[in-house]
């Protein structure tokens, strides 16, 4: 039955689509959709969500305020959003074998902030991985809130193999007696030994927090050790390898920690949860529970190995000499290149990545000596080993062109761009 409105203004408000009401925003969205269709996405922290996830996020749930938690809200009319949030919680519990899950954090950074608000106090010592070694801003980097509010000490990697220096972690923990130790990061290409971190935390009586934002999809598929049996608390994003909407989760098996976390998220750090995003999280987590997700992660890892191997054959230096995960770091110093100019050249060739500091990097953060590459988005698109071998060759062509013609690499860029666009036409995104 067609709705009847009492005025033309109301009919327009409830019936007009975006293209007819705000052409400027529609144009920007269309341009971004075209970019995603026509470029190969290798940013390791990005992925491509399903149409169902996008549909859930663009629903009437965006209208609903729901401060509090299921069954304990500060507003009426929450019975249906309670169902949605409970679905998200139960699915996350099942995936990660967690007793308690908070699905309300708006981002991974806010999930980390809520954990710190709950479990440590300003001035306490925290021990996390340094940003240049592969850590994350929220783990105590100076520009971040965690670096300003806490006495942040940082561990790094060994110079000989660029892997986490667990001996240094132990030595720093004994020396500084941190209240919290943080494991995880944003550019760690090898598996993390959470059991080792637990041993170190126990030696000094520290809380162990694991940030598994990058590897949550791997953990969900059984392709990486689950941190839950070892950590006091675990945080993650819901995008990246989980292939959901942008958002965060906090997980724990400790009921006392769970109570503190819930209070820290609301009312401590956030107000009303984003129920439309939580619905999208629930849908994405439902997809993770399907057998096809395990096959997807298996392909992500296989593609990463192929890409790393191809780049090595093209003379690239891969940090840690390979990858166990979905990402890799390319050290550009042997080629005499910088991360920023390489990122720009690759983007002109239709390949999107990000400049990234490498361990012991002497360049500024906006310059860097490396790039970070990841395979989740390309794998979601349908790329397999053959496609990632081609991509590795194309990256090699762009880098070689940049070495030979640092002032104007347009010939190599245009040649690769044509090949990229032909490949992308074979693997379209949303219909």
Swiss-Prot record:
EC number: 2.1.2.1
InterPro entries tied to this protein: PyrdxlP-dep_Trfase (IPR015424), PyrdxlP-dep_Trfase_major (IPR015421), PyrdxlP-dep_Trfase_small (IPR015422), Ser_HO-MeTrfase (IPR001085), Ser_HO-MeTrfase-like (IPR049943), Ser_HO-MeTrfase_PLP_BS (IPR019798), SHMT-like_dom (IPR039429)
An example Gene Ontology biological process: tetrahydrofolate interconversion
The keyword Transferase is assigned to this record: yes
Domain of life: Bacteria
Site, Plays an important role in substrate specificity: residue positions: 239
Listed GO CC annotations: cytosol
Cofactor section: pyridoxal 5'-phosphate
Residue positions where N6-(pyridoxal phosphate)lysine is found in the record: 240
Catalyzed chemical reaction(s): (6R)-5,10-methylene-5,6,7,8-tetrahydrofolate + glycine + H2O = (6S)-5,6,7,8-tetrahydrofolate + L-serine
MF terms (GO), sorted A to Z: glycine hydroxymethyltransferase activity; pyridoxal phosphate binding
Pathway listed: One-carbon metabolism; tetrahydrofolate interconversion; Amino-acid biosynthesis; glycine biosynthesis; glycine from L-serine: step 1/1
Residues that bind (6S)-5,6,7,8-tetrahydrofolate: 131, 135-137
PANTHER family named among the record's database cross-references: SERINE HYDROXYMETHYLTRANSFERASE, SERINE HYDROXYMETHYLTRANSFERASE 1
Function: Catalyzes the reversible interconversion of serine and glycine with tetrahydrofolate (THF) serving as the one-carbon carrier. This reaction serves as the major source of one-carbon groups required for the biosynthesis of purines, thymidylate, methionine, and other important biomolecules. Also exhibits THF-independent aldolase activity toward beta-hydroxyamino acids, producing glycine and aldehydes, via a retro-aldol mechanism.
Family: Belongs to the SHMT family.
Subunit note: Homodimer.
Protein name: Serine hydroxymethyltransferase 3
Organism whose genome encodes this protein: Colwellia psychrerythraea (strain 34H / ATCC BAA-681)
Gene: glyA3
């Amino acid at each position: 039955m067609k709705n009847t409105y009492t005025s033309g203004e109301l009919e327009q408000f409830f019936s007009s689509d975006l293209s007819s009401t705000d052409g400027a925003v529609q144009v920007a969205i269309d341009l971004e959709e075209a970019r995603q269709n026509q470029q190969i996405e290798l940013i390791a922290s990005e992925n491509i969500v399903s149409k169902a996830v996008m549909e859930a996020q663009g629903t009437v749930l965006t209208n609903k305020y729901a401060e509090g938690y299921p069954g304990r809200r500060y507003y009426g009319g929450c019975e249906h959003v309670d169902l949605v949030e409970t679905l998200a919680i139960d699915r996350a519990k099942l995936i990660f074998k967690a007793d308690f899950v908070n699905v309300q954090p708006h981002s991974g950074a806010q999930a980390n902030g809520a954990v710190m608000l709950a479990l440590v106090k300003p001035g306490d010592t925290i021990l996390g991985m340094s940003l240049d070694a592969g850590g994350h801003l929220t783990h105590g980097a100076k520009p971040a809130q965690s670096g300003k509010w806490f006495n942040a000490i940082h561990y790094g990697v060994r110079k000989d193999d660029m892997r986490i220096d667990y001996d240094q972690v132990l030595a720093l923990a004994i020396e500084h007696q941190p209240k919290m130790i943080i494991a995880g990061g944003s550019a760690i290409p090898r598996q993390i030994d959470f059991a080792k971190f637990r041993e170190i935390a126990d030696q000094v009586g520290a809380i162990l927090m694991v940030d598994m934002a990058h590897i949550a999809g791997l953990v969900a598929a059984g392709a990486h050790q689950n941190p839950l049996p070892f950590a006091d608390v675990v945080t993650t994003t819901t995008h990246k390898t989980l292939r959901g909407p942008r958002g965060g989760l906090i997980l724990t098996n400790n009921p006392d920690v769970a109570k503190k976390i819930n209070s820290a998220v609301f009312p401590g750090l956030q107000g009303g949860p984003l129920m439309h995003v939580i619905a999208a999280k629930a849908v994405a987590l439902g997809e993770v529970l399907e057998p096809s997700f395990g096959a997807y992660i298996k392909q992500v890892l296989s593609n990463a190995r192929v890409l790393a191997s191809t780049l090595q054959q093209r003379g690239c230096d891969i940090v840690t000499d390979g990858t166990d995960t979905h990402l890799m770091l390319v050290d550009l110093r042997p080629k005499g290149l910088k991360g920023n100019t390489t990122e720009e050249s690759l983007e002109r060739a239709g390949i999107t990545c990000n400049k990234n500091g490498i361990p012991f990097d002497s360049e500024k953060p906006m310059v860097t000596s490396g790039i970070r590459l990841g395979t989740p988005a390309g794998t979601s698109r349908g790329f397999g080993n053959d496609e990632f071998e081609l991509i590795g060759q194309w990256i090699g062509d762009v880098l070689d062109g940049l070495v030979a013609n640092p002032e104007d690499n347009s010939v190599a860029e245009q040649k690769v761009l044509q090949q990229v666009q032909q490949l992308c036409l074979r693997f379209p995104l949303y219909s």
